[in-house]
């Protein structure tokens, strides 16, 4: 049971956490994977190499410590993380393993400060939060299993179509091998896909945004070939592009995600860059089915060859009479602006519009800064980060 004394002790350890920084979570992951290598089948090891996951986990732990006396402030974070966990098929027993290694990490990095009262407080705090996640994730699993076309664990799907969308993005249309219905989803959500690439010692699970409106029959994901020309090419994305063919099978976990279009009587502005167009495409198709008016689509990429869904989007926008503006950073073209996206030059629904963002973190930070400067209410800015979460604005 989490007591007031525990809360007081946790808050007193905040300076210790802040002084340790992400080194704490780096040590935690190294320890956990050393003792429990089977978890490498679940965690994205690429994010371990880049350090993004360590930073994201540290920020989550620090936020929990700071808000442990006001857990309502963490509601949105809990929902986001719970959805992501279900796309990895996280189970209650995993929390026991994580808790053990987190507590041992604190003991090893701060042996003098990790007194018995501190250990008891962090043990109570961790397992209190773990139960919050277990309960929420259990509810999500049950809800999806009981819904039409739903399922609980992995389900086998077959690649029905494979379509090149741009220089680095290819779409895969996936249908269930059992011939049954598929679970509906909200436009903007993602699915977890599990594969075992050639040369990999582990099963690999990745999340990809669904890029078409829900129809109860099939899913479409649109995958960017990551790290082209780099020393660290995307393991799963390259495997999907190079090896997975029409007729091949993959395992999917049910649609998840707390970023999605919410129907309101407001104008809608969709802003994306690069492969960030994928969830926006699902939203666009959904808005078209609703005959939604007052939609603005803003998109940026490097060049025409990297313009994902160019024709598909143009057709939708022309049919619906919506507004579109595109920027190419490296070249000019008809009806396309060159350079960086400049929102002040456009007529936008600043006072009442809902703004949905997706793309590289630097791009979204740049856009959010502009939106806030223009007077857009922060509550009307919604965004999706591919990979470990990051804050875009204070």
UniProtKB/Swiss-Prot annotation:
Which controlled-vocabulary keywords does the entry list? Answer: Detoxification, FAD, Flavoprotein, Heme, Iron, Metal-binding, NAD, NADP, Oxidoreductase, Oxygen transport, Transport
Q: Which InterPro entries match?
A: Cbr1-like_FAD-bd_dom, FAD-bd_FR_type, Flavoprot_Pyr_Nucl_cyt_Rdtase, FNR_nucleotide-bd, Globin, Globin-like_sf, Globin/Proto, Hmp
- Hey, where's the site called Involved in heme-bound ligand stabilization and O-O bond activation on this chain? 29
Q: Which Pfam families match?
A: FAD_binding_6 (PF00970), Globin (PF00042), NAD_binding_1 (PF00175)
What are the Globin domain coordinates in residue numbering? 1-138
Annotated active site residues, numbered on this chain, are: 95, 137
The record's cofactor note says: Binds 1 heme b (iron(II)-protoporphyrin IX) group per subunit.
- The answer to keyword NAD applying to this record is yes
What is the protein's given name? Answer: Flavohemoprotein
Instruction: Tell me which species this is from.
Output: Vibrio cholerae serotype O1 (strain ATCC 39315 / El Tor Inaba N16961)
List the gene name: hmp
């Amino acid at each position: 049971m989490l007591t007031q004394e525990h809360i007081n002790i946790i808050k007193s350890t905040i300076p210790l956490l802040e002084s340790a920084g992400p080194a704490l979570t780096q040590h935690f992951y190294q320890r956990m994977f050393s003792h429990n290598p089977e978890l490498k089948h679940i965690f994205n090891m690429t994010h371990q190499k880049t350090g993004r996951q360590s930073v994201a986990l540290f920020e989550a732990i620090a936020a929990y410590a700071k808000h442990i006396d006001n857990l309502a402030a963490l509601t949105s974070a809990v929902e986001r993380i719970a959805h992501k966990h279900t796309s990895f098929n996280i189970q209650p027993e995993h929390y026991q393993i994580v808790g053990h290694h987190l507590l041992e990490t604190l003991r090893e990095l701060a042996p003098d400060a990790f007194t018995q009262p501190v250990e008891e407080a962090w043990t109570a705090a961790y397992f209190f939060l773990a139960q919050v996640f277990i309960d929420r994730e259990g509810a999500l699993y049950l809800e999806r299993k009981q819904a039409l076309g739903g399922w609980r664990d992995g389900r086998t799907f077959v690649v029905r179509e494979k379509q090149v969308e741009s220089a680095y993005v290819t779409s895969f249309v996936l249908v269930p091998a059992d011939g049954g219905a598929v679970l509906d989803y909200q436009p903007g959500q993602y699915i977890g896909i599990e594969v075992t690439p050639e040369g990999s010692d582990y099963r690999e699970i990745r999340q990809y945004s669904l890029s078409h409106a829900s129809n109860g029959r099939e899913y479409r994901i649109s995958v960017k070939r990551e790290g082209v020309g780099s020393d660290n090419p995307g393991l799963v994305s390259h495997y999907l592009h190079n090896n997975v063919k029409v007729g091949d099978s993959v395992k999917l976990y049910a649609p998840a995600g707390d970023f999605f279009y919410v129907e309101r009587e407001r104008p809608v502005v969709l802003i994306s860059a690069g492969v960030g167009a994928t969830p926006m495409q699902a939203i666009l198709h959904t808005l078209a089915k609703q005959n939604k008016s007052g939609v603005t689509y803003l998109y940026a990429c490097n060049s025409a060859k990297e313009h994902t869904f160019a024709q598909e989007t143009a057709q939708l926008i022309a049919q619906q009479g919506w507004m579109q503006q595109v920027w190419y950073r490296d070249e000019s073209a008809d009806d396309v602006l060159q350079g960086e996206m400049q929102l002040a030059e456009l007529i936008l629904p600043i006072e009442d519009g809902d703004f949905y963002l997706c793309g590289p973190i630097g791009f979204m930070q740049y856009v959010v800064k502009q939106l806030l400067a223009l007077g857009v209410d922060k509550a009307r800015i919604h965004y999706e980060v591919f990979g470990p979460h990051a804050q875009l604005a204070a």
